């Protein structure tokens, strides 16, 4: 079972040229993937007003649900960044699971602050630009965790 988080505002291909299209998402959904949200316009929640955060969360959720016909309960925080306010907003808007690259987990909302491994294109390549199973293995086994640090102070 795989979960895929995405931004719902996919019609703007000039801003997000590598985004999946709705037909791609619908095909993935039919193939059994669980589709989750990643905001509507790729904002960083901690940098926005509560009004904007709610609008982004609700808008993304609604758009994906309309296209897939399935409730959206998964959310991936952009860059893994969140504040207690953002966690409360996720809960308020009906999400049940929130994924972050930050190792901090809110003990009051453990399912809304689930740590995940952050990998991006090029994150597991060697000095010559080739895929490196050794680097990937180190990342997966937490032996080389440069992407697992979080400078944000979380107050719970």
Model-derived features: positions:
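C-terminal active-site subregion of NodB/CE4 polysaccharide deacetylases
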Residues: 30, 47-156
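Histidine/lysine/aspartate-rich catalytic loop segments that bind and position anionic ligands
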Residues: 20-51
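A short alpha-helix capping/helix-coil boundary motif
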Residues: 2-5, 40-41, 64-68
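Residue-level signal for pocket-adjacent positions within structured domains
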Residues: 15, 40, 109
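General secondary-structure edge motif
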Residues: 8-9, 33, 40, 70
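Extended, charge-rich helix/loop segments that form flexible
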Residues: 1-31, 152-156
